[in-house]
Amino acid sequence: MPKGLVTRVGDGVTDSRPGSGRPHKGVDLFAPAGSIVTAARSGRVKRVIDGRSATNKNAQRAGLWVDVEVAGGQIDRYLHLGEASVSEGQRVKRGDAIGVIAAAHESGSGDAPHVHFEVRASDYDREKKDYGQPIDPKFEVV
């Protein structure tokens, strides 16, 4: 979660993207570039991936992201980071710094700096080639 001022909350989990109709699988929290992003829940950093220079369009749109595995196997995902301050395998507690929000048009963030936060029911399924179902974060993160 961005620490400090959240200037607005964008599309929710049930919203579809304008133009493409793709589902939005998280919530966008807008805050100034460079704002510290903190862990919503305690867990273990499962992966830190930098998709900014990837050839895969989905990875490019995600930019730099961090996945934290929390209790019950759920994944908390933080996309559009300018830098990550954690490494894979690291344990984090709620409120620990994960990274910082990227500037606009960097790290797949679009026109305004924000962190895209999502909760997934489970980790990546190699057979389905997909992550677990998205869960509305407001029901999981109190």
Describe each PLM feature range.
Residues 1-2, 84-96, 113-142:
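Acidic, glycine-rich catalytic/binding loops that coordinate metals and/or anionic ligands
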Residues 1-65, 94, 103:
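Surface-exposed, glycine-biased beta-strand/turn segments
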Residues 18, 78, 98, 117:
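Short alpha-helical segments in extracytoplasmic peptidoglycan/chitin-binding modules
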Residues 28, 77, 100, 134-136:
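Conserved beta-strand positions that form and line the central face of beta-propeller blades
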Residues 32-33, 38-39, 72-95, 123-124:
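Short histidine-centered loop motifs in beta-beta connectors
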Residues 96-108:
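A short, conserved strand-capping beta-turn/loop at the end of a beta strand
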Residues 40-85, 109-116:
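Zn2+-dependent peptidoglycan hydrolase active-site motif and core
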